[in-house]
Amino acid sequence: MRLSIYSSILLLRAMCLVRPTFGFPATTCRCMPGDSCWPSSTDWAHFNASIGGRLIATQPLAQACHDPYYNETECQYLQKHWTLPALHDISPSSIMAAAVAKDTCDAFTPRSKPCAPGDMVVYSVNASSPDDFSRTIRFSQQRNIRLVIRNTGHDYLGKSTGAGALSIWTHYLKDIEFVNYTSSSYTGPAFTMAAGVQGSDIYNVANGRGLVVVGGECASVGPVGGYTQGGGHSALSSRFGLAADQVLEWQVVDGTGRLLTASPTQNPDLYWALSGGGGGTYGVVYSMTVKAFPDFPVTGVVLQFDTKNTSSKDFFQAVSYYHRDLPTYTAAGGMAIAQITRSSFLLTPLTLPNKTTEEARSLIAPFIHELETLHIPYQLNITQSATYLEHYKKLIEPNPTQLVQNGQYGGRLLPLNVIESNNTQLTEAVKTITQDGVVFVGIGLNVSSSVVGDVWNSVLPAWRTAALSVLLSTDWPAGANRSTMKTLADRMTSKWVPILTALSPDSGCYMNEADPQQPDWPQTFYGRNYETLYAIKKRYDPFDTFYASTAVGSGDWQVKTDGRLCRVKGNT
């Protein structure tokens, strides 16, 4: 597999010795289908030939549920599987999250309603090499077409799609290579992954070598894209840190078509930006090399209780006790995912690397004692697995988090001092938010310097003091009224997220699990790093080729009501 990755890299570097012209024409807005500047069918055919026939004219995934393409059998299949990421992963254009799909048709709107493309990309390049990246970048610039980057489309903020856009689709770049890595900062086992690799791919390969890597809780998420570039929390984060903390180097094609290596010693500014500064804006990553670690046994804890046989007061008192004890779990290397509603609590799971069942039981004993003192019935399951992959398949992969969680989203990183000094106010916040029908998911972890050491990257600084990454969500039933959903989205922005912000005014939010309408997103998602990241963006993407919602530099643009991407006046 090394030959596959690096032969492509050498080929593009040779081609770049004689560089074609890059850059956009001097216009305010990107071209859209129907515009006089939109490429003709002949233009598209010529471009397709230049990339070996890899251009795809996209079709809405749900068109089988709408006239004139209606097919009852296909539509029923789509409706049954619509919430499974795998259905969308293999599509070059499907928008997974309903909240950012806008007017793109889905499998549940009326059959008679036209299947509009909405914010779906118009064309997609099934990329097989860095050369495909470079040629697509150049074509998008010459023809003034919006360009986006996509692997699986696992995306709550709409970064991997756009009306009238051309997409670089990396999904079938699946090479994985084991590396004995040596550098001034790290010597040890590592893996180089191509851009289309998904979590399940690398977990299985690593397990086969007796190793683990830091990756997402959802098996379908692609580690190389926005997950790691945005920081990336993991069930192993309290042991090793965030995904961005593991990166040794990147191979990336920038906005001028150059294939670059980005590491602490080569193009270090680009390495720093890609490692936590957000995806889809500095360039198109072809591969990523990350640290790997010896495998270990893992103990998992699943705990649930509800209000069926207890009062709301006692229920939320128990929630308070859980948060009180959470730092003890994370200090022991544990990572906890707790889903809280107004009537239920589900810890699913608490992942404890290299701990025995006895150690796990001892860790949670104080919390269990509080539940019993409150006379709250509970269900507890403690399971030990011989390897991390076994634990993952038993307790993480079967979770509801593996489904497409349609809803309105918001989030906040809550510092450790909130739990230590303001746990009463935190409990009141959880109660107020969940009483409105909002689901509160608290991801408990410790990625402070005591865990990660002296790392050098652009991860949002608020992560280093965070005890909880909170994701809020509301329900989005099939066929939901979009006006009603927009009202809930606005309440997320104006009411529920601000409740958490008041608890942590100097913190921020995990940019991949956030409110798409976050009003102060540069500060909230990037903190003090934003201005430096913006300068790096301009250095490696001088023509503003790459745009993604809430990505660095996206404030220079605005999306019109028809989906057209235009420069904000004064930004040229």
Swiss-Prot record:
Q: Which domain of life is it from?
A: Eukaryota
The record's SUPFAM superfamilies line, in alphabetical order, gives: FAD-binding/transporter-associated domain-like
Q: Which cofactor does it need?
A: FAD
Q: Which residues are glycosylated?
A: 48, 71, 126, 180, 309, 354, 381, 422, 446, 481
Where is this protein found?
Vacuole lumen
Question: Record keywords: 4Fe-4S included?
Answer: no
Which InterPro entries is this protein grouped with?
Answer: BBE, FAD-bd_PCMH, FAD-bd_PCMH-like_sf, FAD-bd_PCMH_sub2, FAD-linked_Oxidoreductases_BP, Oxid_FAD_bind_N
Involved pathway(s): Mycotoxin biosynthesis; patulin biosynthesis
What GO biological process terms are annotated to this protein in UniProt? patulin biosynthetic process
What EC numbers are recorded for this enzyme?
Answer: 1.-.-.-
Q: Which UniProt keywords apply?
A: FAD, Flavoprotein, Glycoprotein, Oxidoreductase, Signal, Vacuole
Name where it mostly resides.
Answer: other
Q: Please report which protein family the annotation says this sequence is part of.
A: Belongs to the oxygen-dependent FAD-linked oxidoreductase family.
Task: Write out the function statement from the record.
Answer: FAD-linked oxidoreductase; part of the gene cluster that mediates the biosynthesis of patulin, an acetate-derived tetraketide mycotoxin produced by several fungal species that shows antimicrobial properties against several bacteria. PatO acts with patJ in the vacuole to convert gentisyl alcohol to isoepoxydon. The pathway begins with the synthesis of 6-methylsalicylic acid by the polyketide synthase (PKS) patK via condensation of acetate and malonate units.
| Protein name as catalogued | FAD-linked oxidoreductase patO
Organism of origin: Aspergillus clavatus (strain ATCC 1007 / CBS 513.65 / DSM 816 / NCTC 3887 / NRRL 1 / QM 1276 / 107)
Query: What gene name does this entry carry?
Result: patO
